[in-house]
């Protein structure tokens, strides 16, 4: 796959950045609709986004570099080069959510009211963003047979044929899962007014899909012999179940 979308003068604009930008833009459009459902301020949401998005990019890069520091030890300037990938979504989520929490606390706004609205947009951005991995020929799984890959569209087959070998299109598996979760979260946002349910459902469902898909990947970040993404996913599932249970229990009490 050609990772370059187009050139502006001598500057090569990569598909990776273009696709992330498209995901962010469509996420904002979806948030406009979801703010109306929850009667939340879209202006406040935009302010929140302007803080969360750059924080998430920084967090995603920092998280990746921490676990892959040996690749940057001899050339530290490359830490700042994100154009070819090297963003870990878990780091982005952690830093983005933390930045939003601090901002909304300062603004004296309800944290869960806005992250509930944001959850479908976040997972939509993730679903679209995975296609950036496709154009970078990264985040794929282990080798597969030609017979297996032949079940996929021709352009997927070509993109997953890397250096003479076909690979699992794990980016596609996760993209499809994330789109399904997005649709469910929009539905849930309409059906429940309990603050925190939608956001914690996002954490749990994304983590569930990521846990299984991560097991197929060949480029996982490791902590010893443990895949970091699977460890974080297990914690996310437990956290989600715990919070949703307590939110429902608290509502029943009153």
UniProtKB/Swiss-Prot annotation:
EC number(s) on file: 2.5.1.145
Keywords linked to the UniProt accession: Cell membrane, Membrane, Transferase, Transmembrane, Transmembrane helix
GO MF term set: phosphatidylglycerol-prolipoprotein diacylglyceryl transferase activity
Transmembrane regions: 11-31, 49-69, 84-104, 169-189, 196-216, 228-248
Family per record: Belongs to the Lgt family.
NCBIfam families listed in its UniProt record: lgt
Entry protein name: Phosphatidylglycerol--prolipoprotein diacylglyceryl transferase
Natural source organism: Clostridium botulinum (strain Loch Maree / Type A3)
């Amino acid at each position: 796959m050609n990772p370059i979308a187009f050139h502006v003068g001598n500057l090569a604009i990569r598909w990776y950045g273009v696709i992330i930008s498209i995901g962010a833009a469509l996420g904002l459009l979806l948030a406009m609709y979801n703010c109306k459902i929850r009667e939340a301020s879209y202006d406040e949401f935009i302010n929140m986004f302007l803080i969360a998005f750059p924080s998430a990019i920084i967090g995603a890069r920092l998280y990746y570099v921490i676990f892959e520091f040996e690749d940057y030890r001899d050339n530290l300037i490359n830490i700042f080069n994100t154009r070819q990938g090297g963003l870990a979504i878990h780091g982005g989520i952690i830093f983005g959510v933390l930045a939003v929490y601090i901002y909304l606390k300062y603004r004296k706004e309800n944290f869960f009211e806005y992250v509930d609205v944001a959850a479908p947009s976040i997972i939509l951005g993730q679903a679209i963003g995975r296609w950036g991995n496709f154009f970078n020929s990264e985040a794929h799984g282990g080798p597969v047979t030609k017979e297996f890959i032949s079940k996929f569209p021709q352009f997927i087959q070509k993109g997953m044929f890397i250096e003479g070998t076909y690979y699992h299109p794990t980016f596609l598996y996760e993209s499809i899962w994330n789109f399904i979760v997005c649709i469910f979260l929009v539905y849930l946002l309409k059906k429940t007014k309990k603050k925190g349910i939608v956001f914690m459902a996002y954490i749990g469902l994304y983590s569930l899909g990521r846990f299984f898909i991560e097991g197929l990947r060949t480029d996982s970040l490791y902590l010893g012999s443990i895949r970091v993404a699977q460890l974080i996913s297990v914690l996310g599932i437990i956290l989600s179940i715990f919070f949703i249970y307590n939110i429902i229990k608290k509502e029943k009490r009153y």
